[in-house]
Amino acid sequence: MATFLLEVGTEELPASFVESAIQQWRSHIPNSLEEHLLTPQSLKVYGTPRRLAILAEGLPDQQPDQTVEVKGPPAKAAFKDGKPTKAAEGFARKQGVEIKDFELRDTEKGEFIFVQKTTLGKPAVDVLADLIPTWIFSLEGKRFMRWSDGEVKFSRPIRWLVSLLDDHLIPIKLENSTGTISSDRTSSGHRVLHPDPVTIKHPQDYVATLEKASVQVDPEQRQTLIKEQVHACAKAVKGKAVISEDLLAEVTYLVEWPTAVVGGFESEFLELPAEVITTEMVSHQRYFPVEAPKGAKLLPHFITISNGDPAKSDIISSGNERVIRARLADGQFFYKADQAMPLAEYLPKLETVTFQEDLGSVRAKVDRIQANALWVAKQLQLDQKVTQQVERAAQLCKADLVTQMVGEFPELQGVMGEKYAIASGEPTEIATAIVEHYLPKGANDQLPQTLVGQIVGIADRLDTLVSIFGLGMIPTGSSDPFALRRAANAILNIVWAANLDLNLDQLLTETTAAFAQTFAKFQPEVQQLRDFFGQRLRSLLQDEQTIDYDLVNAVLGEKGEHTQRVLVDVLDGRDRAQYLQTIRTNGTLDTIYETVNRAARLATKGDLASDVLDPKGVVQPKLFEQSSEQVFYDGLLTLLPQTQAAQSSRDYQKLVQGLTKIAPSVSQFFDGDDSVLVIAEDADLRANRLNLLGLLRNHALVLGDFGAIVKS
């Protein structure tokens, strides 16, 4: 067994690409080696801003020989009068064997020729020499560039290549912007701390050799070092570090030899909102903020991660202190200047901000958000006070976009709106809604907690969805430039989390009609929006609510045919899906599945409308020939109030109890001593019996379409 090393040395790589490349190689390379019969005992992928590396231990020196059986032509086509035909000769030539190697064997289709063909395994060095370039250039990332005259693309120019199998060099040549890069044993140390070339004698020496050259190649080790140093620096200034996982991941891939350096600034800057200070530190400067040991009060300190000389930490600290002072001084100026007038007076300036080229300004969007918010408030039957709060919050929700602070720090939209609203004397409910209406900002982000914030958030996203759909810019595949999937997901999650009794279908109809009146040349189709929300419902129910796919189909329809019903009552759709999952788990579904499903399948041969529940008027007892029909009919009469109660109160337990109780009667109807032939020759008898089955199907349909459910 051998140890294999590949190191690709480059110009400074973007941190996001290094992290992505490591994940890609961790996924792809083990599969590639296994496919080529060179599975190692262990494989690690390393990465820094200047290199990507693979270290595989326990790699076979050579592929194993492989013997495969190849089926040839029929014997009667391969031989004529005992002599090989051209077909036999061609097959032998193609497989690299001789006629004497043929084996005749009987099969179900007659006698055929077979040969045993052995392929000799290649040395690992030769296989790796072919694979390595494909691994390098299969990496994907943003803004790749061509670094030579050919089609070769990579994130940054490749400067060196180390490729070893034990102490043997694997010969590789790559075309690059500076010519041809040939593999050798020479790597590079830290650009500042160890600029001299580094020789790698054996792959097993790689990590230790680079560490001596001030490069920690293992990102997990670098991250551990960073966390330890950051905590130590914070403790030294009697505070605790605020470590964001995103920032920690980013700085891990920005440095090769991390050194945490603490810096400070004047306490007067702490009068700024904490969000302004931390945004400048984290998003712009990649600093870790420092808080008081107890509570969340910021201290006038920060911690930066240097990739330079630890001996020069004082100089590094001073330089960063100058930067943060200047940035926070700008923040002080913006904060004071923005409060020179009330937040509401910024509204006219929104005319200068374009929402979308064909859709006008953000000021016009605000008017649409207000209208949407009032429709939501009306549906929820809110009192006048809360409705007025909703209207005012919707009016002010985008006003901070034209403040100087948000112009400098776009990440603070909504946050500064809340601060400025309070400073302007707006009620807390309105100020909070301004910041909350942007929530959630991502898949795992928190949701708005106040009713006003929830309503304005829904109204804003409804406008975005209807407007962009009106332009025909419907998301396709992975392309979703306006984040419409995220917007629809947010609406559904807000409704579910807050248990808002909303008719989303009606809201889509109202907002679409209003949009069409405002923009006559753009006509969004409500059905397209329904279908889109149906896709999001399906995804959320399966992926986040962990509902089985067939139970989701039972609620939405296998082709989305029940989506509109769910949009009319989104809470009910979720509750039905969850209840179906519950009764599958506890076994209740199995007790009614066969009966209901059989009835539903046969009922398709009838013409009873799916919303009919009362047997009176659609079933004629005078036509009954067997007692099982009467018992079935009586069971439906008993089931009716239980189903109606389930519809009005969403108490589907009563419905399932009723279906469980009627199941034996239906089984008797089908298979008992007094069973009947449903598809009778007499048309009236046939229709009467199909209506009985159709009624049972309809009662079950109140919970879900049992025809879509797969038997457990």
Curated annotation (Swiss-Prot):
Reaction equations catalysed: tRNA(Gly) + glycine + ATP = glycyl-tRNA(Gly) + AMP + diphosphate
Keyword Protein biosynthesis: yes
A molecular-function term among this protein's GO annotations: glycine-tRNA ligase activity
Main location: cytoplasm
GO process annotations (BP): glycyl-tRNA aminoacylation
Compartments it resides in: Cytoplasm
GO cellular component labels: cytosol
UniProt feature coiled coil, ranges: none
Pfam families associated with the record: tRNA_synt_2f (PF02092)
Annotated keywords: Aminoacyl-tRNA synthetase, ATP-binding, Cytoplasm, Ligase, Nucleotide-binding, Protein biosynthesis
Domain of life the protein comes from: Bacteria
EC number per UniProt: 6.1.1.14
EC class (word): ligase
Protein family per UniProt: Belongs to the class-II aminoacyl-tRNA synthetase family.
Quaternary context: Tetramer of two alpha and two beta subunits.
PANTHER family: GLYCINE--TRNA LIGASE, CHLOROPLASTIC_MITOCHONDRIAL 2, GLYCYL-TRNA SYNTHETASE
Protein's name according to its UniProt entry: Glycine--tRNA ligase beta subunit
Native organism: Acaryochloris marina (strain MBIC 11017)
